[in-house]
């Protein structure tokens, strides 16, 4: 249990028996609002709580007066060395140094398992991510969402969830018809015809490889086939080939999905119809007309009666159409059917990773899941923004009219998988990220992945060169008394809290920020040793101080390795 969690538990124990003006806290919903956290300014103490502010709403008493009462009670908590109150009623704590020294011992005993917490309790979570259209190999623009989804899955597994990684193959609809027509042209090209790639078709040269496969298997036989048979053959061969390319690209990123679900197979299994029938049974479908969509003013638009889902009953802005004018299902109908299929497989918690251009789908999908599951299932939709690819500050063109684009393979060959994975997590997922090819290979503190890996490598260099140290139970850690050493220990103690909040908010970038902060504090401490021999990790003729600092350094290594493991990044023991 982390220091913050320990103090929170003690505070709750005190509040359960405390009587203030005949008010005793027995309502757990009140305690759920209790915060024990680290202040932004370390001068305000090691931890703070909002307990007095919460209780003032129920006791109808000035929070400063309540805080003074609480201070008397909380002062007996053995881990607390100092306590004070600041307006409007926050209570700040300083924690005994012995508690922080115990953190070093705990980390060295648990090693990379330090900070592991289990609040998932084996609950199943479905994470759908990537789901790129199978119309071509993955370009580097897909990498951010792919890495985010994979690392989030790792993180949720770390905190005790059973995670299923799923990829939805969009192998039905207009884009597949365009793919078939584009491949057929390339097939004709292989046969020697001069072709013209029309507007709206896929121009990529990779399609010529599929044309060659078709020629090897069928010769010129496809030319004489009827349209439906030829379409089926080209479709099946193309999708198989392109999904193989996509899986290979994902493997280059270190990503492997557990399940691949086909949209066309769901249609064959009448999942859409079954989903619609369920909504009809729930009386959540009606026939009506919608207002003209925003942004279409001036366009020749005519209202028509159509099948609508009552999504506004579940928090959406408008009700949603399920059928097109020609009677075929809308994209939304297929989408909610897919989530109905997930629910039918027993998933009560789903996470969906989408590009930020899909922000309009958030409310409607949440509404659909709530309706289909009677509120028993939830979906968390995580949006990722674009990545600007730069080379020493200059924009890198992502695509050309020829259909060529910057591939995942290109980037990994240039900078390496681990660099790509780390850099993609250096910003909150819905914030635009700059990926500069020149900067991500710099060996400087301006390159976060180098900075973190260098800290880990420095730890191992130190261990390799250190003399034999004392057994940990024989070390007097009170010799670690400098401001920089205590700051680093307190930072390491936050690791469990960082893992927990990152998992609960589905924000793995918090771990990236934390690892950079740990590396920065460690490098700073190392730098002080370059200025003063007394601050070096290995101090001649002082085996106790050397041992204490080596165990502190090893703690840094274990925490960094633990974080990088969540990212599926190999921690380096030496820099090359």
Swiss-Prot record:
GO terms for cellular component: cytoplasm. It catalyses: tRNA(Arg) + L-arginine + ATP = L-arginyl-tRNA(Arg) + AMP + diphosphate. This is Arginine--tRNA ligase. Belongs to the class-I aminoacyl-tRNA synthetase family. GO terms for biological process: arginyl-tRNA aminoacylation. Keywords: Aminoacyl-tRNA synthetase, ATP-binding, Cytoplasm, Ligase, Nucleotide-binding, Protein biosynthesis. Monomer. The gene is argS. The keyword Ligase applies. It comes from Ehrlichia ruminantium (strain Gardel). CDD domains: ArgRS_core (cd00671). Its EC number is 6.1.1.19.
């Amino acid at each position: 249990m982390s220091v913050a969690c320990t103090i929170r538990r003690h505070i709750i124990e005190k509040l359960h028996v405390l009587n203030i003006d005949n008010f005793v806290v027995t309502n757990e919903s009140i305690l759920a609002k209790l915060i024990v956290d680290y202040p932004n300014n370390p001068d305000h103490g090691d931890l703070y709580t909002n307990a007095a502010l919460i209780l003032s709403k129920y006791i109808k008493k000035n929070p400063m007066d309540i805080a003074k009462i609480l201070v008397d009670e909380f002062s007996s908590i053995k881990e607390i060395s100092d306590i004070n109150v600041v307006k409007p009623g926050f209570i700040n704590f300083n924690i005994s140094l012995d508690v922080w020294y115990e953190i070093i011992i705990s980390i060295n005993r648990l090693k990379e398992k330090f900070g592991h917490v289990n609040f998932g309790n084996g609950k199943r979570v479905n994470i759908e991510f990537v789901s790129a259209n199978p119309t071509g190999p993955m370009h580097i623009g897909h990498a951010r969402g792919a890495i985010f989804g994979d690392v989030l899955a790792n993180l949720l597994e770390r905190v005790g969830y059973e995670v299923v990684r799923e990829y939805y193959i969009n192998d039905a609809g207009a884009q597949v018809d365009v793919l078939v027509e584009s491949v057929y042209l390339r097939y004709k090209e292989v046969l020697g015809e001069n072709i013209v790639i029309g507007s709206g078709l896929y121009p990529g040269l990779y399609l010529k490889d599929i044309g060659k496969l078709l020629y090897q298997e069928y010769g010129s036989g496809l030319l004489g086939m009827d349209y439906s048979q030829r379409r089926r053959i080209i479709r099946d061969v193309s999708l198989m080939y392109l999904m193989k390319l996509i899986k290979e690209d994902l493997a280059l990123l270190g990503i492997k999905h557990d399940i691949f679900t086909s949209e066309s197979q769901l249609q064959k299994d009448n999942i859409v119809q079954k989903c619609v029938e369920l909504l009809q049974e729930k009386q959540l479908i009606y026939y009506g007309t919608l207002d003209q969509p925003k942004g279409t003013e001036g366009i020749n638009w005519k209202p028509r009666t159509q099948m609508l889902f009552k999504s506004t009953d579940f928090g959406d802005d408008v009700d949603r159409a399920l059928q097109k004018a020609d009677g075929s299902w809308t994209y939304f109908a297929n989408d909610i059917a897919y989530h109905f299929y997930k629910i039918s497989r027993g998933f009560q918690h789903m996470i969906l990773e989408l590009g930020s251009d899909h922000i309009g789908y958030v409310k409607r999908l949440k509404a659909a899941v709530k309706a289909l599951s009677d509120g028993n299932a939830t979906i968390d939709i995580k949006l990722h923004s674009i990545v600007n690819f730069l080379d020493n500050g200059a924009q890198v063109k992502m695509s050309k009219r020829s259909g060529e684009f910057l591939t995942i393979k290109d980037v990994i060959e240039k900078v390496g998988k681990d660099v790509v994975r780390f850099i993609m997590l250096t910003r909150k997922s819905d914030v635009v990220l700059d990926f500069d090819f020149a900067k991500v290979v710099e060996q400087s503190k301006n390159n976060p992945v180098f900075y973190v890996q260098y800290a880990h490598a420095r730890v191992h260099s130190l261990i390799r060169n250190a003399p034999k140290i004392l057994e940990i139970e024989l070390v007097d850690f009170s010799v670690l008394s400098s401001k920089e050493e205590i700051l680093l220990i307190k930072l390491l103690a936050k690791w469990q809290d960082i893992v927990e909040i990152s998992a609960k908010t589905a924000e793995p970038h918090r771990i990236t920020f934390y690892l950079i902060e740990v590396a920065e504090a460690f490098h700073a401490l190392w730098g002080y040793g370059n200025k003063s021999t007394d601050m070096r990790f290995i101090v001649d003729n002082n085996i106790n101080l050397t041992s204490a600092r080596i165990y502190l350094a090893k703690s840094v290594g274990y925490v960094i390795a633990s974080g990088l493991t969540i990212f599926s990044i190999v921690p380096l023991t030496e820099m090359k």
